[in-house]
From Swiss-Prot:
GO terms for cellular component: extracellular region. The gene is MAN3. One of its GO terms (biological process) is polysaccharide catabolic process. It holds the Pfam family Cellulase. Disulfide bonds: none annotated. The lineage of its organism: Eukaryota, Viridiplantae, Streptophyta, Embryophyta, Tracheophyta. Keywords: Glycosidase, Hydrolase, Secreted, Signal. Residues 1-24 form the signal peptide. This is Mannan endo-1,4-beta-mannosidase 3. The active site is at E199 (proton donor), E317 (nucleophile). Substrate binds at W84, N198, Y277, W356.
Length: 401
């Protein structure tokens, strides 16, 4: 058999097995008894962040990068990807101004969802950014001011009726009909969950009450009024607020205007999230001290998710810059994954983790120091893939208990 024919057969077999796997894993991911489930069985995962998917897919000539990452991730056993469903103003803007969209960019998001389905990867899609990257809440404030609305600071994003109206208008993207699959987003099981905001913070009220009472409840209720099939999460980093004062000692020395407990007790929020960047939050401390804090950070939130929230927990962003050395990053990731696995094995709420972040070949201009290209970083790739497989095996074992 020639090499060309053999390669064609292997490729065909891979696509057949992938199609069978995707069919077996069809259906919406739900929550039952504080854990994720799929088709009545426990669902545990290892996944990744790739915020750039829609931005790149807006140019059809660059879509191969999206395909590469999703295919390689699927091959490595990764089953969930978190990415942006927003780009407000600026280059390749999805939302050019309030309610005005670029169909070309929307079709990029359509492609991302279609490709994710093709490779059996579930998506967590975020509606807006805390930060100025890709617009964020600052862009919403600029739009309002440009329309003559008096806004004193960016944190009025959480309270001003005009700004909340703008966001609700964007949230209606859940009703879009995908131009490729011909399935409305709200009816597509490829989407695991919607996320209200990437890393909400409110410097005007460190207690977390403004974000909780004036914003999360209202936005969560609005999302569910449009789409009650998908899970919903806030997008929080996990900082504790005033609801349990002693828990604030777990924070890395400061508050950010959110409250992990109260923000996640809202009924419409289906699962809790935390993020962790020890090399940023604890800069200057030793690797050992950072790892010790990381273990405490994860366990504290796992305990609260299990005992107070009674909802699944996801480590939705974590990473360590490769500029500290590949070996240092591998040690860090192995430790984090071990903690996630052990807590998932202990029972209850730990659902999985999403490393920040996967890139395709030739995307050096996107590299923030945390980027991982599967295959180019073989030791890191092996660590990520091993975690994916043992989490899947654990889910299967739990299903047979």
């Amino acid at each position: 058999m020639s090499y060309t024919h053999r390669r064609s057969c292997i490729s065909g077999l891979f696509l057949l097995l992938l199609a069978l796997s995707c069919e077996a894993n069809s259906g919406f991911i739900g929550v039952k008894d504080s854990h994720f489930e799929l088709n009545g069985s426990p669902f545990l995962f290892n996944g990744f962040n790739s915020y750039w998917l829609m931005h790149v897919a807006a140019d059809p000539a660059e879509r191969y990068k999206v395909t590469e990452v999703l295919k390689d991730a699927s091959t490595a056993g990764l089953s969930v990807c978190r990415t942006w469903a927003f780009s407000d103003g600026g280059d390749r803007a999805l939302q050019i101004s309030p309610g005005v969209y670029d169909e070309r960019v929307f079709q990029g998001l359509d492609f991302v969802i279609a490709e994710a389905k093709k490779y059996g990867v579930r998506l967590i899609l975020s509606f807006v950014n805390q930060w100025n990257d890709f617009g964020g809440k600052a862009e919403y404030v600029w739009w309002a001011r440009n329309a003559g609305v008096q806004i004193s600071n960016d944190d009025e994003f959480y309270t001003h009726p005009i700004l909340k109206k703008y966001l609700k208008n964007h949230i209606e993207v859940v009703t879009r009909l995908n131009s490729i699959t011909k399935v409305a987003y709200k009816d597509d099981a490829t989407i695991m969950a919607w996320e209200l905001m990437n890393e909400p913070r409110d410097q005007a009220d460190y207690s977390g009450k403004t974000v909780n009472v004036g914003w999360v409840q209202e936005m969560a209720s609005f999302v569910k009024s449009l789409d009650n099939k998908h899970l919903l999460e806030v997008g929080m980093e996990g900082f504790y607020g005033d609801s349990i004062p002693e828990r604030k000692l777990v924070n890395p020395g400061y508050q950010v205007g959110t409250d992990f407990i109260s923000n996640h007790l809202i009924n419409e929020i289906d699962f809790a999230t935390i993020h962790a960047y020890t090399d940023q939050w604890l800069s200057g401390q030793s690797d050992e001290a950072q790892l010790a804090w990381m273990e405490k950070w994860i366990r504290s939130h796992w305990e609260d998710a299990r005992n107070i929230l009674k909802k699944p927990l996801v480590l939705a962003e974590f990473g360590k810059s490769s500029r500290s050395g590949e070996g240092s990053r591998d040690i860090f990731m192995s430790s984090v994954y071990r903690n996630v696995y052990n807590l998932a094995k202990e029972g209850g709420t730990m659902g999985g983790s999403l490393v920040w972040q996967l890139m395709a070949h030739g995307m050096e201009n996107y590299d923030d120091g945390y980027s991982i290209v599967l295959g180019l970083n073989p030791s890191t790739t092996q660590i990520i893939s091993n975690q994916a497989h043992i989490m899947t095996a654990l889910a299967h074992s739990l299903n047979h208990e």
